[in-house]
Curated annotation (Swiss-Prot):
It comes from Trichormus variabilis (strain ATCC 29413 / PCC 7937) (Anabaena variabilis). It comes from the Bacteria. Catalyzes a reversible aldol reaction between acetaldehyde and D-glyceraldehyde 3-phosphate to generate 2-deoxy-D-ribose 5-phosphate. One of its GO terms (molecular function) is deoxyribose-phosphate aldolase activity. GO terms for biological process: 2-deoxyribose 1-phosphate catabolic process; carbohydrate catabolic process; deoxyribonucleotide catabolic process. This is Deoxyribose-phosphate aldolase. It catalyses: 2-deoxy-D-ribose 5-phosphate = D-glyceraldehyde 3-phosphate + acetaldehyde. Its main location: cytoplasm. The active site is at residues 96, 157, 185. Pathway: Carbohydrate degradation; 2-deoxy-D-ribose 1-phosphate degradation; D-glyceraldehyde 3-phosphate and acetaldehyde from 2-deoxy-alpha-D-ribose 1-phosphate: step 2/2. GO terms for cellular component: cytoplasm. InterPro entries: Aldolase_TIM, DeoC, DeoC/FbaB/LacD_aldolase, DeoC_typeI.
Length: 226
């Protein structure tokens, strides 16, 4: 039961995600209004909607977060950098960047580092590096985490949500690796309050989810949470 957990306000942990391919401008306004109303950390949307979200949230607390190289991470370094710079120009202050998994798995760690470092240095914004942990071994997770931290990442993010969701085990592992030097964003498949609280207690400092409103309703109606 949610009532058995510590009294944690989950709202400031939530990156309110709208990453469905069918997202509309009307939904973007709805997500921004919800993020402001419930004091979420950010809205996380595709680059095409960054300018709209930045205008809606101007002067308000929630940040505008977007995704770079999403969801595969397989675009070229120059394309990712351009995408990131354009997003910042349009008003994004947080960038969730998918790591180049092919380079990582083939041992080309220099390419992985260079790509992340360029985005961190040239944008000067919060960068959350998406590791896609469900596709990595524990050894690869450590290598990827170390590269991202050395390159200047602000957060490590577990997943895109396209290849499975966040797990408590992965969050614990990342906390052990990072020793709290950077934040940890758990993302993918977060649908219940208990699941969200388990991830926070394991070490997550952000939660990426499209179910933020559901989590708030579960928080406010604990008697209905199973």
């Amino acid at each position: 039961m949610a009532a058995d957990y510590p009294n944690i306000d989950i709202a400031p942990f939530i990156d309110h995600a709208l990453l469905t391919p069918t997202a509309t401008p009307e939904q973007v306004d709805q997500w921004c209004e919800q993020a402001d109303r419930y004091n979420f950390a950010s809205v996380c949307l595709y680059p095409t909607y960054v300018k709209q979200a930045a205008e809606f949230l101007h002067g308000k607390k929630p940040k505008v977060c977007t995704v770079i190289g999403f969801p595969t991470g397989a675009t070229t370094r120059s394309v990712k950098l351009y995408e990131a710079l354009e997003a910042v120009e349009n008003g994004a202050t947080e960038l969730d960047v998918v790591i180049n998994l092919g380079c990582l798995k083939s041992g080309n760690t220099e390419a992985v580092h260079r790509e992340i470092a360029e985005i961190c240095e040239e944008t000067g914004q919060v960068v959350k590096v998406i590791l896609e942990t469900n596709l990595l071994t524990d050894a690869e997770k450590k290598i990827a985490a170390d590269i991202a931290m050395d390159a200047g990442a602000t957060f490590l993010k577990t997943n895109t949500g396209w290849n499975g969701g966040a797990t408590v085990a992965d969050v614990r592992l990342l906390k052990e690796i990072t020793r709290e030097r950077v934040g940890i964003k758990a993302s993918g498949g977060i649908r219940t309050l208990n699941q969200a609280l388990d991830l926070i207690l394991a070490g997550a400092t952000r939660l990426g989810t499209s179910r933020g409103i559901d989590l708030i309703h579960q928080r406010d109606n604990p008697e209905k949470v199973e």
